C-alpha cells in the first residue's frame, strides 16, 4: 500500500486550518495536538466560550464536543483521483441544502472544517493511506457543473455507511438512487403512476426496489412483522375493545382482569395480548408468555413460584398469557385456580374453541370471556393496505387497462413491485377474516413473483426483462391454492356445520343442504362421519314416513367406505337431496323419548317384569310361575287380550302422552 504525504494529495492541499473543538479557534492543523493539551488546562470541557467562526450556509451550528469526540479522517486516493464522483455524504449534504427545511440534513462527519483559501495545504498528524480497491471506483455519477462548483471535503470513518449505501444504489436520504440518465432500466415513479394506472383512491408510498422488498419479507412471517404495538393501531373488534368500552378503559388504565380471549384464528387474540404486554412493560409489570402446545405443568408452576416472589418482595404484578389454553387438560387448568383467585397472577388465555366446553368451569367463572369476531372485509383491506404501504408497493387501478410487460429494463437493475387493487380485494375476501392468512398470503405472492423474475433472467440469458413486477389476482389465488374455509374437524365449527346440515334437511331446503354438505367436505371433513349422521337422520326425522330412507343412508355409508373421497361426494349429495325432499315424521323419535322420560322420572324401584312375559327355560322357573298364562299369538286367529306392560303402567300410551 502506498502512503501519500500532504504534498502529494490534491485533496489535502485545499485545506489549511482546522477548528479547536474546545475554544473554537482556528489554527494550522499541524498545531492542533499541542494546542489541545494547553487548551484543556485553561478551559475545562463544556466551559469554554466559543469563538465566532464561519459556518457553511445551511449547516446547523454545533456546540463544543470533548476531545475524545474528535475523529480521524481518511482520504481515499481512488475517490480523489475522480473529482467528478461525489461521496455519499456530499450527495446527502447537497440534497439537505436544497430541501424545503433549509438544510436540516446533517453531515455524516463528526464536525466539518470551515472553508479555507484556495491552494492552502493541510498537514495531518498521521499518514493517509491510498486505497486501490476496485470496489471503490465509479460508485456514482455527478454532473459536471456540480463537480466544478463543489470542492472535496474530508472523509470520516462515519462515511463508511454512506459509501455502502452508495454501492447499494441508495442515495444520501435513504431512498433508491433514481438518477437514471445512464441506466437503461431507469424509470420515473411519478411517470409510472400516471401511465401505469396507480390507484388514486388508495394512498401509496414511494416505490421501493424489488431487492429491498425481498429483504424486508425474509425472516419472520409478515403477519408477525406487522403486529401493532398500541390499541390505536389495533384494527377491528370495535365491539370488544372499541372506544368507550369497558375492556378498553381497563387496558388504558392498566387495570387488567383475568381474561379468556375466544375467537377464530387470525382475529387478533395474540395481537391484543402483545399490546397488553407492551403496555405492561411501561408500568413495570411482568408479562410471561407460554404456549399450551409445548408447555408442561412444571413450567406453569415455575412461573407461578416466581410470580409469588415478585409479589412478596417487590410488590410487582405478573400477567401470564397462555396461548391455545384449550390444549391444557382439566387437571392442568386446575393449577391456575388458587393463584388466579388470590391475585398472584393475572391470567389471559387465548383459544379458538368454545370455552364452555374446553375450559374448566371453575376457572371460567374467575375470568372474563371476551368474544372476538371474525374480521370484516373492510378491516382486512385496511390491514393489507397498511402492509402494502410499509413494503413500498404501489396499488394499481385495475379499471385502467395497462400492460406491465410493455416496459423492459436491464436484468441487473431492480424493478419496482405493483399489485392490482382487485388482487387486494380478492385476498381480503379469500382470507375469510383471518388477518394472518391474508398477510402471509400477500408475502407468499410477492416472494413468488420476485423469484420468478429472477429465474427468468437467470435461465433465459436475456439482457432485458419487465421493469415492473405486477402481482395479479391469479397470483393471490394461486398462493392460497383455494378459498380459505374456516373449518376445524375437532372444533366448534365442526359441530356448527353438521347442525346446519341437519336442520336444512329437516326444513326440506335442498339448496342449503347441499351447501352445508359441500362446506364440510371442502373443509376436510371425514365423509364417513357425514354418512353416519345421515343414517341417524333417516330414522330420527324421516322415520316411518319413508322407511326406504334408512336403506338409502346405509347404502351411502357403504359406498363412502368403498370408494372414499373425492368420488363419494356425489353419493352423499344424492342422499342429502333425497332426505331433503322426503316426507318427515318424528313419531318414532318422539315416542322413544317419552319412554326415556318415563324411566328417568320414575321414583322408587322399577316395576318387575310380569310373570307371564318371563321365559322359563328350566323346570324350577316353571314351578315358580315363569311364563304361566302366556298366550302365543300365532296360535290365535283373533287378537289376543293380553297385557304387555307392568301393572303400574297399564293404559299408558307413549305415542300420545309424554309422561307415564
From Swiss-Prot:
Its main location: nucleus. Pfam families: AAA, AAA_assoc_2, MgsA_C, zf-WRNIP1_ubi. A zinc finger (UBZ4-type) spans 17-44. Residues 135-155 have a biased composition (Low complexity). The modification Phosphotyrosine is found at residues 529, 557. InterPro entries: AAA+_ATPase (IPR003593), AAA_assoc_2 (IPR032423), AAA_ATPase_RarA/MGS1/WRNIP1 (IPR051314), ATPase_AAA_core (IPR003959), DNA_pol3_clamp-load_cplx_C (IPR008921), MgsA_C (IPR021886), P-loop_NTPase (IPR027417), Rad18_UBZ4 (IPR006642). It catalyses: ATP + H2O = ADP + phosphate + H(+). Zn(2+) binds at residues 20, 23, 31, 35, 39. Residues 50-191 are annotated as: Disordered. Its EC number is 3.6.1.-. Ubiquitously expressed. There is a cross-link at residues 81, 141, 220, 296, 305, 311, 317, 330, 477, 622, 628, 631 (Glycyl lysine isopeptide (Lys-Gly) (interchain with G-Cter in ubiquitin)). PROSITE patterns: ZF_UBZ4. GO terms for biological process: DNA synthesis involved in DNA repair; DNA-templated DNA replication; innate immune response; regulation of DNA-templated DNA replication initiation. The modification N6-acetyllysine is found at residue 628. GO terms for cellular component: chromosome, telomeric region; nucleus; perinuclear region of cytoplasm. Forms homooligomers, possibly octamers. Directly interacts with POLD1, POLD2 and POLD4. Interacts with the N-terminal domain of WRN. Interacts (via UBZ4-type zinc finger) with monoubiquitin and polyubiquitin. Interacts with TRIM14 and PPP6C; these interactions positively regulate the RIGI signaling pathway. Functions as a modulator of initiation or reinitiation events during DNA polymerase delta-mediated DNA synthesis. In the presence of ATP, stimulation of DNA polymerase delta-mediated DNA synthesis is decreased. Also plays a role in the innate immune defense against viruses. Stabilizes the RIGI dsRNA interaction and promotes RIGI 'Lys-63'-linked polyubiquitination. In turn, RIGI transmits the signal through mitochondrial MAVS. Belongs to the AAA ATPase family. RarA/MGS1/WRNIP1 subfamily. The UBZ4-type zinc finger binds ubiquitin. This is ATPase WRNIP1. It comes from Rattus norvegicus.
Amino acid at each position: 500500500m502506498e502512503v501519500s504525504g500532504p504534498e502529494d494529495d490534491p485533496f489535502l492541499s485545499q485545506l489549511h486550518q482546522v477548528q479547536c473543538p474546545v475554544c473554537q479557534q482556528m489554527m494550522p492543523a499541524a498545531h492542533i495536538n499541542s494546542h489541545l493539551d494547553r487548551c484543556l488546562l485553561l478551559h475545562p470541557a463544556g466551559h469554554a466560550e466559543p469563538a465566532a467562526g464561519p459556518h457553511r450556509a445551511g449547516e446547523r451550528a454545533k456546540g463544543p464536543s470533548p476531545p475524545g469526540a474528535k475523529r480521524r479522517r481518511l482520504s481515499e486516493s481512488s475517490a480523489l483521483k475522480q473529482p467528478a464522483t461525489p461521496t455519499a455524504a456530499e450527495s446527502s449534504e447537497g440534497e439537505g441544502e436544497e430541501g424545503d427545511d433549509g438544510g436540516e440534513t446533517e453531515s455524516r462527519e463528526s464536525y466539518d472544517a470551515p472553508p479555507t483559501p484556495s491552494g492552502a495545504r493541510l498537514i495531518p498528524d498521521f499518514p493517509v493511506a491510498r486505497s486501490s480497491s476496485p470496489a471503490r471506483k465509479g460508485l456514482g455519477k455527478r454532473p459536471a457543473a456540480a463537480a466544478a462548483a463543489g470542492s472535496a471535503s474530508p472523509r470520516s470513518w462515519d462515511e463508511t455507511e454512506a459509501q455502502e449505501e452508495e454501492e447499494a444504489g441508495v442515495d444520501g436520504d435513504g431512498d433508491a438512487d433514481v438518477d437514471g440518465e445512464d441506466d437503461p432500466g431507469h424509470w420515473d415513479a411519478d411517470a409510472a403512476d400516471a401511465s401505469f394506472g396507480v390507484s388514486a383512491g388508495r394512498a401509496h408510498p414511494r416505490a421501493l426496489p424489488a431487492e429491498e422488498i425481498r429483504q424486508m419479507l425474509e425472516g419472520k412471517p409478515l403477519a408477525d412483522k406487522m403486529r401493532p404495538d398500541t390499541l390505536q393501531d389495533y384494527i377491528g373488534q370495535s365491539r370488544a375493545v372499541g372506544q368507550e368500552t369497558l375492556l378498553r378503559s381497563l387496558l388504558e388504565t392498566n387495570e387488567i382482569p383475568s381474561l379468556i380471549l375466544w375467537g377464530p384464528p387470525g382475529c387478533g387474540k395474540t395481537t391484543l395480548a402483545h399490546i397488553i404486554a407492551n403496555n405492561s412493560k411501561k408500568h413495570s409489570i411482568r408479562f410471561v408468555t407460554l404456549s399450551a402446545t409445548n408447555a408442561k405443568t412444571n413450567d406453569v408452576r415455575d412461573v407461578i413460584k416466581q410470580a409469588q416472589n415478585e409479589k412478596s418482595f417487590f410488590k410487582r404484578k405478573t400477567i401470564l398469557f397462555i396461548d391455545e389454553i384449550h390444549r391444557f387438560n382439566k387437571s392442568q387448568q386446575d393449577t391456575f385456580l388458587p393463584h388466579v383467585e388470590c391475585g398472584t397472577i393475572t391470567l389471559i388465555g387465548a383459544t379458538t374453541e368454545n370455552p364452555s366446553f374446553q375450559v374448566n368451569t371453575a376457572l371460567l367463572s374467575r375470568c372474563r370471556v371476551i368474544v372476538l369476531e371474525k374480521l370484516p372485509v373492510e378491516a382486512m383491506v385496511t390491514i393489507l393496505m397498511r402492509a402494502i404501504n410499509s413494503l413500498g408497493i404501489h396499488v394499481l387501478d385495475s379499471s385502467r387497462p395497462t400492460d406491465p410487460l410493455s416496459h423492459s429494463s436491464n436484468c441487473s437493475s431492480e424493478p419496482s413491485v405493483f399489485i392490482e387493487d382487485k388482487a387486494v380485494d380478492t385476498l381480503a375476501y379469500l382470507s375469510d377474516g383471518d388477518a394472518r392468512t391474508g398477510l402471509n398470503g400477500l408475502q407468499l405472492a410477492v416472494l413468488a413473483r420476485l423469484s420468478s423474475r429472477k429465474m427468468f433472467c437467470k435461465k433465459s440469458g436475456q439482457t432485458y426483462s419487465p421493469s415492473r413486477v405486477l402481482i395479479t389476482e391469479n397470483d393471490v389465488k394461486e398462493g392460497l391454492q383455494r378459498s380459505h374455509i374456516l373449518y376445524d374437524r375437532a372444533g366448534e365449527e365442526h359441530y356448527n356445520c353438521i347442525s346446519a346440515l341437519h336442520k336444512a334437511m329437516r326444513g326440506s331446503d335442498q339448496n342449503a343442504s347441499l351447501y352445508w354438505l359441500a362446506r364440510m367436505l371442502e373443509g376436510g371433513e371425514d365423509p364417513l362421519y357425514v354418512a353416519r349422521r345421515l343414517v341417524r337422520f333417516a330414522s330420527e326425522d324421516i322415520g316411518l314416513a319413508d322407511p326406504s330412507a334408512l336403506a338409502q343412508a346405509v347404502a351411502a355409508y357403504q359406498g363412502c367406505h368403498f370408494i372414499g373421497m373425492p368420488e363419494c361426494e356425489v353419493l352423499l349429495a344424492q342422499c342429502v337431496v333425497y332426505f331433503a325432499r322426503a316426507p318427515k315424521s318424528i313419531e318414532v323419535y318422539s315416542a322413544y323419548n317419552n319412554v326415556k322420560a318415563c324411566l328417568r322420572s320414575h321414583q322408587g324401584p322399577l316395576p318387575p317384569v310380569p310373570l307371564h312375559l318371563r321365559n322359563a327355560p328350566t323346570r324350577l322357573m316353571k314351578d315358580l310361575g315363569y311364563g304361566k298364562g302366556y298366550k302365543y299369538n300365532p296360535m290365535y286367529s283373533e287378537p289376543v287380550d293380553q297385557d304387555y306392560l307392568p301393572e303400574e303402567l297399564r293404559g299408558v300410551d307413549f305415542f300420545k302422552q309424554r309422561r307415564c
